[in-house]
């Protein structure tokens, strides 16, 4: 056994089906750093698979039964279904097939762990937690759901006793993670294809917190009504709350924005202390809220107030979370993963804060809906979440393998936005149409915010060069 896991060191080659996925690759990287033999397949090469290859992994392009010739263990995500050539081969050969969350849980066994849960904000919060803990000298191991700019990876191998992980609620497997400290950022209706209804999702988060050991800690955002209700259900675990409201144990006050930078003070109400003059180099009330959770945990672990203030000011961000990909002729291009109405509203509010109330800068939102089922289930919310955008452009739905649903198309959403009173909503066909829109509609001082979990990220990243061409 290695010092960091109960996994036998001679378990044999561990094969990841879909190793380039953001959730799978971080686990693979940690295993490589621990000395395990790692291999995996993905449909195409990417920066992530190339990085893993440099670290020593064997990478197969395409998924075929013969890729498992040397494998002894096979790791899959919930996206891998029967009929996948590699999964079928693993079961035919009687190889152990391990869910992603089970393998992550194995890595967590002999560490003290901080699991970041919530419908939105997990990746950014995990990144903030990691960066504050590094600055505080805790040297954590990290497995995140996004690329952390400070590391150029979604994983970090540390020598300290703490591990920070993003806890994904989408398939319920976050309740298998042996957390010591659990963070809950918010709870909104999402991933109903797994949970079935909102009550079951609520119960899932209750179980997430209830699984903590008696010496554990729940860190909860009580600005969110559902999380506040969850806190009311917790009767036998310690709880620390955070937020902007007057009852929060860790509270942000005096929040202002200047040049896209948040300025605020933090009240540590249980301690009777204050951290004055904090800055966070990214806009958005939701980002300040996420930072408070990291402050709450790091303060609980003994980090000094001055260390916290310095670390917040140096925060480097995370890929696809309000990421500036370029500026052309005074027009800023932003790429963001937001694909749920709550996320979209928060990002557009942040964009409005970033350009400021002075001047004539406008926010142009470009959204590619992700999954017909999400658009259908939350249609009215989608129609009302773009209010901070001056112009809204909607691309074709990124199906993610789903069949179309009547009433949940690109054109349905555009019509719905107009019915809900949006003055400037339109459909776009493709990347070329986006280029025309930006050239025709923008002026210096504007911000173009590309939102979605599908191919729109590539559109956003290619846009600055195409505008210059």
From Swiss-Prot:
<dbReference type="GO" id="GO:0008763">
    <property type="term" value="F:UDP-N-acetylmuramate-L-alanine ligase activity"/>
</dbReference>
<dbReference type="GO" id="GO:0009252">
    <property type="term" value="P:peptidoglycan biosynthetic process"/>
</dbReference>
<dbReference type="GO" id="GO:0071555">
    <property type="term" value="P:cell wall organization"/>
</dbReference>
<keyword id="KW-0547">Nucleotide-binding</keyword>
<dbReference type="InterPro" id="IPR036565">
    <property type="entry name" value="Mur-like_cat_sf"/>
</dbReference>
<dbReference type="InterPro" id="IPR050061">
    <property type="entry name" value="MurCDEF_pg_biosynth"/>
</dbReference>
<dbReference type="Pfam" id="PF01225">
    <property type="entry name" value="Mur_ligase"/>
</dbReference>
<dbReference type="InterPro" id="IPR005758">
    <property type="entry name" value="UDP-N-AcMur_Ala_ligase_MurC"/>
</dbReference>
<dbReference type="GO" id="GO:0005737">
    <property type="term" value="C:cytoplasm"/>
</dbReference>
<keyword id="KW-0961">Cell wall biogenesis/degradation</keyword>
<keyword id="KW-0133">Cell shape</keyword>
<comment type="function">
    <text>Cell wall formation.</text>
</comment>
<keyword id="KW-0131">Cell cycle</keyword>
<dbReference type="InterPro" id="IPR036615">
    <property type="entry name" value="Mur_ligase_C_dom_sf"/>
</dbReference>
<protein>
    <recommendedName>
        <fullName>UDP-N-acetylmuramate--L-alanine ligase</fullName>
        <ecNumber>6.3.2.8</ecNumber>
    </recommendedName>
</protein>
<dbReference type="Pfam" id="PF02875">
    <property type="entry name" value="Mur_ligase_C"/>
</dbReference>
<dbReference type="InterPro" id="IPR013221">
    <property type="entry name" value="Mur_ligase_cen"/>
</dbReference>
<dbReference type="Pfam" id="PF08245">
    <property type="entry name" value="Mur_ligase_M"/>
</dbReference>
<keyword id="KW-0067">ATP-binding</keyword>
<keyword id="KW-0573">Peptidoglycan synthesis</keyword>
<comment type="pathway">
    <text>Cell wall biogenesis; peptidoglycan biosynthesis.</text>
</comment>
<comment type="similarity">
    <text>Belongs to the MurCDEF family.</text>
</comment>
<keyword id="KW-0132">Cell division</keyword>
<dbReference type="InterPro" id="IPR000713">
    <property type="entry name" value="Mur_ligase_N"/>
</dbReference>
<keyword id="KW-0963">Cytoplasm</keyword>
<dbReference type="GO" id="GO:0005524">
    <property type="term" value="F:ATP binding"/>
</dbReference>
<dbReference type="GO" id="GO:0051301">
    <property type="term" value="P:cell division"/>
</dbReference>
<dbReference type="InterPro" id="IPR004101">
    <property type="entry name" value="Mur_ligase_C"/>
</dbReference>
<keyword id="KW-0436">Ligase</keyword>
<feature type="binding site">
    <location>
        <begin position="118"/>
        <end position="124"/>
    </location>
    <ligand>
        <name>ATP</name>
    </ligand>
</feature>
<dbReference type="GO" id="GO:0008360">
    <property type="term" value="P:regulation of cell shape"/>
</dbReference>
């Amino acid at each position: 056994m290695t010092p960091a896991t109960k996994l036998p060191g001679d378990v044999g080659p561990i094969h990841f089906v879909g190793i380039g996925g953001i959730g799978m690759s971080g686990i693979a990287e940690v295993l490589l750093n621990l000395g395990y033999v790692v291999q995996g397949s993905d449909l195409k090469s990417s920066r992530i698979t190339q990085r893993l290859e440099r670290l020593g992994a064997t990478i197969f392009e395409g998924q075929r039964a013969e890729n498992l010739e040397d494998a002894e263990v096979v790791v899959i995500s919930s996206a891998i279904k029967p009929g996948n050539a590699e999964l079928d081969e693993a079961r035919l050969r009687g190889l152990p097939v391990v869910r992603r969350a089970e393998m992550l849980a194995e890595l967590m066994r002999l560490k003290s762990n901080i699991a970041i849960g919530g419908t939105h904000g997990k990746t950014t919060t995990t990144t903030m937690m990691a960066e504050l803990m590094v600055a505080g000298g805790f040297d954590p191991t990290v497995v995140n759901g996004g690329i952390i700019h400070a590391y150029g990876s979604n994983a970090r191998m540390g020598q300290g006793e703490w591990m920070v992980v993003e806890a994904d609620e989408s398939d319920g497997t976050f309740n298998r993670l042996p957390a010591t400290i659990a963070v809950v950022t918010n709870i909104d209706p999402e991933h109903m294809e797994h949970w079935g209804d909102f009550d079951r999702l609520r119960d899932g988060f209750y179980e997430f917190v209830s699984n903590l050991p008696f010496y554990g800690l729940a860190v909860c955002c009580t600005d969110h009504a559902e999380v506040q209700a969850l806190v009311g259900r917790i009767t036998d675990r310690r709880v620390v709350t955070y937020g902007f409201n007057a009852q929060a144990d860790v509270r942000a006050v005096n929040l202002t924005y200047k040049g896209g930078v948040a300025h605020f003070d933090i009240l540590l109400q249980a301690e009777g202390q204050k951290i004055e003059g904090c800055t966070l180099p990214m806009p958005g009330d939701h980002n300040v809220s996420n930072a408070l959770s990291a402050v709450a945990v790091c303060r609980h672990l003994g980090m000094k107030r001055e260390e916290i203030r310095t670390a917040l000011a140096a925060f480097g961000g995370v890929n696809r979370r309000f990421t500036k990909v370029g500026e052309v002729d005074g027009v800023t291009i932003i790429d963001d993963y937001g694909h749920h109405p709550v996320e979209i509203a928060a990002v557009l509010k942040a964009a409005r804060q970033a350009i400021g109330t002075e001047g004539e800068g406008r926010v142009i939102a470009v959204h590619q809906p992700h999954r017909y089922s999400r658009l259908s289930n939350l249609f009215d919310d989608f129609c009302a979440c773009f209010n901070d955008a001056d112009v809204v452009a909607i691309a074709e739905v990124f199906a993610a393998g789903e069949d179309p649903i009547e009433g949940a198309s690109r054109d349905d959403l555009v019509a719905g936005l107009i019915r809900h009173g949006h003055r400037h909503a339109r459909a776009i066909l493709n990347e070329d149409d986006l280029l025309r829109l930006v050239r025709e509609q923008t002026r210096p001082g504007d911000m173009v915010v590309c939102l979605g979990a599908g191919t729109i990220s590539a559109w956003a990243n290619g846009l600055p060069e195409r505008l210059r061409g």
